[in-house]
UniProtKB/Swiss-Prot annotation:
Pfam family, one: KH_PNO1_2nd
Cell compartments where the protein resides: Nucleus, Nucleolus
Domain KH: 160-212
Assembly and interaction partners: Part of the small subunit (SSU) processome, composed of more than 70 proteins and the RNA chaperone small nucleolar RNA (snoRNA) U3.
Source organism superkingdom: Eukaryota
Gene3D superfamilies recorded: K Homology domain, type 1 (3.30.1370.10)
Chief location: nucleus
Family: Belongs to the PNO1 family.
GO cellular component: nucleolus; nucleus; small-subunit processome
Protein name: RNA-binding protein pno1
Organism listed in the record: Dictyostelium discoideum
Region (Disordered), start-end ranges: 21-45
Keywords recorded for this protein, A-Z: Nucleus, RNA-binding
InterPro entries the UniProt entry points to: KH-I_PNO1_first (IPR055212), KH_dom (IPR004087), KH_dom_type_1_sf (IPR036612), KH_PNO1_2nd (IPR055211)
Length: 239
C-alpha cells in the first residue's frame, strides 16, 4: 500500500511540473506576440536588403548553349549580328566552342544587368531552334516573350503520309497559312520536322497554338482563319 501511495505522489508531482512548463511556454509565446504587435503598431520599419548587382558577385557566371548540327552554318553566317547585341548592350563575353558545339556566355566586370546572362542564353537558344536573328533579338528588348515547343504527335498520333499532310496543313501553300497565323497573332513560328516552336507573348502563343492544333486535327483553313480573327480582336480589345 505504501509503495502504491508513493508512486501516485510521484505521478502527481510530474504532472504538476509538466503543467508548469506548458504554462511557461504559453506565456513566453504570448509575450513574443505582444512584442510583435507593439512593433507593428509603433510603426517599426522592417529590415530591407539592398538589391544585389552583378558587381557584388565575386565569381564570374557562365552559361553554355548547345547548337545543333544544322544550325552551325547559319550561326557562322550570322555571327556578327549575334555577337554585337550581346557584347555591346548586355556587356557579356561570348565565344563559340567548335569542339563541344556550344556557345559560351560569361559575365564581365562591365556587366550591370543581373538578367543579362539569362537573356543572352534565351536569345542564342531561340536562334538554335531555327528563329531568324531579327526575330530572336526581340528577347533582348522585351521581357514578356517566351518560347513554347511541342510535337505534332502531342496533339494527334499520326504517322507516314498523315503526319506529312498535317505538317503541310500548318505550313500551307508557300507558307501562306503559317504567315497568316504569325501576322494575326503577332508571333513567330518555326516548323522543324515534327517539332513546332512558337515565339511570342503568353496570350498570343496560346491563340497561335490553338490554331495550329486545329489544323493538325483536320479543321479547314478558312474556319481556322475566322476563329483566329475573332479571338485576336477580343485580345486587342482587352489590352
Amino acid at each position: 500500500m505504501t509503495e502504491v501511495i508513493e508512486t501516485k505522489e510521484v505521478e502527481n508531482i510530474i504532472s504538476e511540473q509538466s503543467l508548469k512548463t506548458e504554462s511557461v511556454k504559453v506565456s513566453n509565446k504570448r509575450s513574443r506576440d505582444d512584442e510583435e504587435m507593439k512593433d507593428s503598431e509603433g510603426g517599426v520599419k522592417k529590415t530591407s536588403f539592398p538589391q544585389i548587382s552583378v558587381e557584388d558577385t565575386e565569381e564570374e557566371q557562365i552559361r553554355k548553349v548547345t547548337i545543333p548540327f544544322n544550325r552551325i552554318a547559319p550561326l557562322k553566317a550570322n555571327w556578327q549580328q549575334i555577337y554585337e547585341p550581346i557584347v555591346t548592350h548586355l556587356k557579356l563575353q561570348i565565344r563559340m566552342n567548335t569542339k563541344t558545339r556550344k556557345v559560351e556566355l560569361k559575365t564581365s566586370k562591365s556587366t550591370k544587368e543581373t538578367s543579362a546572362l539569362q537573356k543572352a542564353a534565351d536569345f542564342v537558344h531561340a536562334f538554335s531552334l531555327g528563329f531568324e536573328v531579327n526575330d530572336a533579338v526581340a528577347i533582348l528588348r522585351l521581357d514578356d516573350l517566351y518560347i513554347d515547343s511541342f510535337d505534332v504527335e502531342d496533339v494527334k498520333i499520326l504517322k507516314g503520309d498523315n503526319l506529312s499532310r498535317a505538317i503541310g496543313r500548318v505550313a500551307g501553300k508557300d507558307g501562306k497559312t503559317k504567315f497568316t497565323i504569325e501576322n494575326v497573332t503577332k508571333t513567330r513560328i518555326v516548323l522543324a520536322d515534327k517539332r513546332i516552336h512558337i515565339l511570342g507573348s503568353y496570350s498570343n502563343i496560346r491563340v497561335a497554338k490553338d490554331a495550329i492544333c486545329d489544323l493538325i486535327i483536320g479543321s479547314p483553313p478558312g474556319k481556322v482563319y475566322a476563329k483566329l480573327r475573332t479571338v485576336s480582336s477580343r485580345i486587342a480589345e482587352r489590352f
